[in-house]
A protein has these predicted regions:
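C-terminal catalytic/motor cores of large multi-domain enzyme assemblies
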Residues: 1-138
């Protein structure tokens, strides 16, 4: 899958695309994402580096935004909105209360392209991997 990452620039927004993301390691994805974001900010992206893509990720959490709904940018079929990680009280399985880091994720899908149930499965998997990052190393 080709994944677009929203990058704020001085005059607006670019969505550079990481090609064949599913075939890359987490460290390779991170490196490529940083390189593309820097190219976007320095206005050195080539058209083939921001055109296309099927899925977008927008992280306003880095600006302290807790929760938001992102708008799908065609031709993408879905976009994941990532909110800030905040310390919040949670109830553990043994009914004790603890402070934990919690973040919000909101997935918007174009139902002409992606069935809502498939979107829900995607959210389950994203949540599973974020709650237990060691699974991403396998």
């Amino acid at each position: 899958s080709d994944i677009a990452i929203a990058v704020a620039v001085e005059d607006g927004l670019f969505t550079p695309v990481i090609r064949d993301a599913e075939a890359k390691s987490l460290s390779k994805l991170s490196k490529e994402m940083k390189e593309l974001a820097e190219k976007a900010r320095s206005k050195k992206l080539m058209p083939n580096e921001y055109q296309g893509g099927s899925f977008s990720i927008s992280n306003l959490g880095m600006f302290g935004i807790d929760n938001f709904d992102a708008v799908i940018n065609p031709p993408h079929g879905a976009i994941l909105a990532v909110g800030a990680g905040l310390k919040k009280p949670i109830v553990n399985e043994d009914n004790t209360i603890a402070v934990s880091n919690v973040m919000s994720l909101t997935l918007s899908v174009d139902h002409r392209v992606i069935d809502g149930a498939l979107g829900a499965e995607l959210m389950q998997n994203i949540t599973k991997y974020l709650e237990d990052p060691v699974l991403m190393m396998a």
